[in-house]
Structure formats: structure tokens, C-alpha cells
């Protein structure tokens, strides 16, 4: 249910997975009560061997009996150990970072350098050539294609100061090998690690990008690294092309630029900042022609004559089309570059008059360079400016929280101006807000379903304890693997909660079945009888539980060694389920019997008091 409530890109990514599991569970349930019984009748022939004679079952029960007997002797200690494990997990949980989604490796690096507004075409072309040459020097790079400027379409609003370079990589099998660092290993284990894992390892994606970023730290250029599809989605969703961005809203562009520059200086001091760039909203350069109407009239010219000369000689005019085979190209005419590349040359451009005279343009207009907005952003009916922040080595949530504290302490935002944190952080906050009320609602629905099944609040609560206890293993495995909390991780945790609750239900059903049967047979007169019933019921659950864990582990462990596109997302889903199944097994086989014993013993004690009977205590705890 929580996955179906996700929206936007996270919903499109994970809803198919949820639909697949839902349909699979539905048809599996349907077939288990229709096809499976029929096949059992047809295929299971001859004498059926009792479970007590099954060697696997006998082996598992032999291992489990000492455990459950110890648990029933030290019930409170067992529960205390479980609670202590949960408490010890809290620091690890708090140290987990947060992000929207793990990086989805597309196999292509998208490099987006940003310069100050006003860069010329010649400078931009030269800069692209230098950057492409540096990128192509890396042995992992197959080919590089860079561009500056944009197409004449509203779907590509990139300014000329923002370049885009596509870096296509070779297959990972052809990447460089680096020495494996095992300095943190104990000295006796290092040779074993070299023997089993090898003395070298391939360079990682993050290390390759870090080397490229270091090689491309050019003066006046702010680097941003992403991937093509991810970049397009981010740009269309929020307009921010980096993991984190700040949108500044206000009535005056000049003030917005000042706030952006101040934010740029402050954010550079935040640990984990790779590059930060505030848009120079008013940093565009313009060539202004202020026409002298009296001078134009004195020479018998009109404003249109002068403007046409400026447009044709300087901007160029298409006069014809040349046909080259099946191809056609427009032919434009304008002054040579050396006659129009500075203001002095423009002042010498000659404007013909009706009587054949040639008048310098400088006598008919004042020509000067001015600055102004390179582009005007408007969002939510307000002027805006963006600050782009590219970060490395930190989780997005932790970085933004620290950055917010520094900005609040060092940046004074004037009245009428507001800051909005955007980028992937905006997605993360949106998903977090949605899950914050959907997950508790889902747990409430599960509790209601459990109560409808058991008709007991106590049993329902015992089953729900499976969820927090299963989180212990999930959190610790995430911590050791260095994974951040993300939507993918929460999807795995939600799936883990369902499996943990399911195994808890089966354990309670087995314990109840033996308890009720012995109660009907009159064999429930003491706590010793209760413990023997619990041992018998729990022992019946060992093999099904181990089969469930083995099947889930067999299906999930290969994901942890997978590579390629999508592997990083799938690992985040599988990791909490793998870690959680370990602690869920301990809970089901140890903690639930202890809690069940305390609850039933308390009920028997009060029942005995009400009937005036005294319950004895038997030490006969062996399974017959």
C-alpha cells in the first residue's frame, strides 16, 4: 500500500514492482487453495513419512530445542536482550544518511561546466576543445561530445554560458585496475584478502568522476557532474541540474544576484561541497545603439534606414539559398568579423544616404556596452535566481541540514525575499512527507486485519513486534554497507515488514494450535505444561521458518553481487530485507515464544486465582 501512494518519478519506478508482487501474491494464494491440493492428490503417492522422521527436520529441532528451553527459563532476559539490541540500533540508525534515490548508473557521464555570462563564441569553442581533450585522455572514456548554446526551441532553454558534454565510457571490464587498499584490515588477514579478492580492483565511478573533476578545475568554470537521463528529469522537474540547489525569490533581480553571491561564499565552506555557482542574473553584456534622431533627419535618413543597416551589416541577412545536390543552405551576408568585433570598428560602419554620401554610424548613434539580465526567470509569479551546489562524499539530507544552519547564521535575507531548497532534496522531502502518514496508516490497517483474524489485541501486538525487531538487522547491514536511507531502501523495509509480520502470524498460529489442543485434552494445568506446549508448537515452526529464510536469501543475495544499470537501486531494496531476515528469524524463534509464555502464564495465573486453584510448576520440558 505505501508504494502505491508514491508519486512522480519514484512512483513510476516502484509501482510496477508493487503491482508485480501484488499479482504474484494473489495468484499464489489462489493456486494454493485450488491447484495445489489437486496436485498433492495426484503426485503424492505411497506412505507419507512423518515429520518426526525427516532427517532435516530432526536436525533443525535438535539444534533449536536447547535454544527454546533456555529462552523459556530466561524469558525476561531474552526480551531484555531484544530490547537492548533495538536500543543499540538507534545510534546506527541516526548515523545513516538520507537521499532521494541512489545513483542509477546510466553508463554515461554528463559534464555540465558553467561560466560567467558574456562568454564569446570563440572562447566557448576553445573551452570545449580543451575540456574534450582532457576528458578523452582518460583510458576509461570511449568518446566525448561537447556543445555550448541551445537550439531555437523552448524545450532547450540552456544559456550560452552553460555547456553540456556527453562522456561515453567503455565497458567496466576495460577500466583501470587500482591497488586494493586493505590498510584497515588486521595484519594477519591482509594476505588472505589478497589471495581471495586479489591485489587490485577496478576504479569506481565516484573515483573516476573525482579524477575528471580535478583535471577540469579551470579558472572561471564551475563543474557539475550527472547523467543524461537523470539530468533531463531533474531539469524538467525542478530546473536544478545539481543534486542540491537553492531558489531565491524576490522583486529585484539585482538584489537576488547579491543574495546568490553571498550564498555561494557561505556554501563553499560546507564540508562536502565540490562546486557551487550562483547565477549572475544581471551579468549579461549587451551592445546598445542609442539613435540620434536629429542627426539622422539632417542627412535625410529615417530610423528604419539606420536600423536596417545595423541589422544587415552587423547581424547579417539571408539573401539567397545555395543548392548543393539534395541539400540547401541559406547564404547570409554581413561585415567581416574584424570590422564589427569592437565598438570603435562599429562606429566606422558606413551608412549610405539618398544622395550617395556615406555617413559613419558613430555620427548617427551612440554605441556602448551595457550590462543587464542575461535571462529573466519567473516562477510562481515571482522573479527568481538559482544557486547550484554539486556535492561529493556526503548524503543529501545531512548536507542540506548543515548548509541550512550555516545559511541561517551567516546570510541575512531581506524582507520580501525567500529561499527554497530544491533539487533532489525537494524530491526527498516530498517522498518523506508522503510516507510519514502512509506507513503508520498501513501499520494500523495491518493491526486491524490481525485483530480480525486473532480476535485478540495481545496476539496482534505480539505479531506487530516483528516489525521493529526485524529493523535491527536491516539497519546494521545498511550501516556496514554505507547505504543511505532512500526511497529504494524504504521500499525494501516495507517488504521486510510484510514478511516479518507473516512469519510472526504463522508462529502464533502454531503456538495457539498446540495450546488449544492441550487445553481441550486437560493437559494445561501448570506453567510446565504451558512451556511444553510452547516448545512443541515452536519446534514445528523451525523448518518452515528456515525454508522461508533460505528461499528469500537465495533470491536476494545474487542481487548484492550484481553490476550494471539498475543494480545500485536493487541493492538498496535487497539489503534491508537480507539483514532484517536474520533478526526476524531470531525474533520468531526466540522472542515471540518468550513473550507468548509470559502472556499465557499471566492469563493462567489470573484464571487460577479466579477459580481458587493453585497452579503447580512442572520441570518436564522435553518434547515428546
PLM feature spans:
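A short beta-strand structural signal in non-transmembrane regions
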Residues: 112, 165-167, 176-185, 190-209, ...
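Interfacial helix-loop-helix hairpins and adjacent transmembrane helices
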Residues: 9, 15, 34-86, 117-123, ...
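Signature of alpha-helical transmembrane segments and their immediate interfacial
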Residues: 1, 52-102, 135-136, 142, ...
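Solvent-exposed, membrane-proximal periplasmic/extracellular interface segments of envelope transport
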Residues: 122-236, 240, 265, 294-316, ...
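Transmembrane alpha-helices and their membrane-interface boundaries in multi-pass membrane transporters
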Residues: 1-6, 13-51, 165, 469, ...
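Transmembrane helices with small-residue packing motifs
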Residues: 3-13, 48, 83-119, 170-176, ...
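Extracytoplasmic/periplasmic membrane-proximal domains and adjacent transmembrane bundles
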Residues: 224-226, 245, 257-260, 264-442, ...
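Hydrophobic transmembrane alpha-helices and their membrane-interface caps
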Residues: 5, 23, 31, 445-541, ...
Amino acid at each position: 500500500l505505501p508504494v502505491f501512494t508514491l508519486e512522480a518519478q519514484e512512483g513510476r519506478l516502484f509501482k510496477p514492482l508493487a503491482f508485480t508482487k501484488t499479482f504474484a501474491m494473489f495468484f499464489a494464494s489462489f493456486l494454493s487453495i485450488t491447484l495445489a491440493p489437486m496436485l498433492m492428490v495426484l503426485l503424492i503417492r505411497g506412505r507419507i513419512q512423518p515429520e518426526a522422521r525427516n532427517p532435516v527436520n530432526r536436525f533443525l529441532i535438535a539444534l533449536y530445542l536447547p535454544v527454546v528451553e533456555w529462552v523459556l527459563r530466561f524469558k525476561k532476559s531474552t526480551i531484555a536482550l531484544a530490547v537492548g539490541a533495538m536500543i543499540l540500533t538507534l545510534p546506527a540508525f541516526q548515523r545513516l544518511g538520507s537521499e532521494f534515490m541512489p545513483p542509477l548508473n546510466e553508463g554515461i557521464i554528463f559534464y555540465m561546466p558553467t561560466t560567467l555570462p558574456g562568454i564569446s563564441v570563440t572562447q566557448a569553442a576553445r573551452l570545449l576543445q580543451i575540456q574534450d581533450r582532457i576528458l578523452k585522455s582518460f583510458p576509461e572514456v570511449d568518446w566525448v561530445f561537447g556543445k555550448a548554446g541551445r537550439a531555437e526551441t523552448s524545450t532547450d532553454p540552456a544559456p550560452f554560458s552553460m555547456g553540456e558534454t556527453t562522456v561515453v565510457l567503455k565497458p567496466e571490464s576495460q577500466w583501470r585496475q587500482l591497488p586494493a587498499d586493505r590498510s584497515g584490515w588486521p595484519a594477519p588477514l591482509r594476505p588472505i584478502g589478497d589471495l581471495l579478492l586479489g591485489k587490485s580492483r577496478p576504479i569506481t565511478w565516484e573515483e573516476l568522476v573525482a579524477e575528471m573533476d580535478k583535471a577540469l578545475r579551470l579558472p572561471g568554470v564551475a563543474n557539475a557532474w550527472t547523467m543524461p537521463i537523470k539530468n533531463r528529469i531533474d531539469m524538467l522537474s525542478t530546473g536544478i541540474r545539481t543534486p542540491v540547489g537553492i531558489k531565491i525569490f524576490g522583486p529585484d533581480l539585482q538584489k537576488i544576484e547579491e543574495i546568490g553571491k553571498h550564498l555561494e561564499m557561505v556554501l563553499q565552506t560546507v564540508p562536502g561541497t565540490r562546486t557551487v555557482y550562483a547565477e549572475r542574473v544581471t551579468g549579461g553584456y549587451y551592445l546598445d545603439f542609442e539613435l540620434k534622431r536629429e542627426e539622422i533627419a539632417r542627412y535625410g535618413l529615417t530610423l528604419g534606414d539606420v536600423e536596417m543597416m545595423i541589422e544587415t551589416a552587423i547581424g547579417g541577412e539571408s539573401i539567397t539559398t545555395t543548392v548543393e545536390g539534395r541539400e540547401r543552405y541559406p547564404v547570409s551576408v554581413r561585415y567581416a568579423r574584424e570590422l564589427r568585433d569592437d565598438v570603435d570598428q562599429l562606429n566606422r560602419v558606413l551608412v549610405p544616404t539618398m544622395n550617395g554620401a556615406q555617413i559613419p554610424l558613430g555620427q548617427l548613434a551612440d554605441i556602448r556596452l551595457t550590462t543587464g539580465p542575461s535571462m529573466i526567470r519567473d516562477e510562481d509569479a515571482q522573479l527568481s535566481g538559482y544557486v547550484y551546489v554539486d556535492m561529493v562524499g556526503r548524503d543529501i539530507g545531512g548536507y542540506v541540514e548543515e548548509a541550512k544552519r550555516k545559511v541561517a547564521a551567516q546570510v541575512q535575507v531581506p524582507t520580501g525575499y525567500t529561499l527554497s531548497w530544491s533539487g533532489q532534496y525537494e524530491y526527498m522531502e516530498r517522498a518523506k512527507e508522503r510516507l510519514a502518514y502512509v506507513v503508520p496508516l498501513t501499520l494500523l490497517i495491518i493491526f486491524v486485519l490481525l485483530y480480525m483474524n486473532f480476535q485478540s489485541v495481545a496476539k496482534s501486538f505480539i505479531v506487530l513486534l516483528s516489525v521493529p525487531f526485524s529493523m535491527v538487522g536491516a539497519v546494521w547491514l545498511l550501516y556496514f554497507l554505507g547505504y543511505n536511507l532512500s526511497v529504494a531502501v524504504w521500499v525494501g523495509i516495507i517488504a521486510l515488514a510484510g514478511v516479518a509480520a507473516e512469519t510472526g502470524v504463522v508462529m502464533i498460529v502454531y503456538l495457539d494450535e498446540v495450546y488449544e489442543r492441550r487445553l481441550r485434552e486437560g493437559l494445561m494445568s501448570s506453567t510446565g505444561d504451558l512451556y511444553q506446549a510452547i516448545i512443541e508448537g515452536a519446534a514445528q515452526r523451525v523448518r518452515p521458518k528456515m525454508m522461508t529464510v533460505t528461499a528469500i536469501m537465495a533470491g536476494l543475495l545474487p542481487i548484492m553481487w550484481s553490476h550494471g544499470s539498475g543494480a545500485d537501486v536493487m541493492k538498496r531494496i535487497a539489503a534491508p530485507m537480507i539483514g532484517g531476515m536474520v533478526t526476524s528469524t531470531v525474533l520468531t524463534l526466540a522472542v515471540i515464544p518468550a513473550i507468548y509464555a509470559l502472556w499465557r502464564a499471566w492469563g493462567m495465573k489470573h484464571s487460577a486465582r479466579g477459580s481458587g486453584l493453585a497452579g503447580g510448576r512442572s520441570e518436564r520440558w522435553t518434547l515428546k
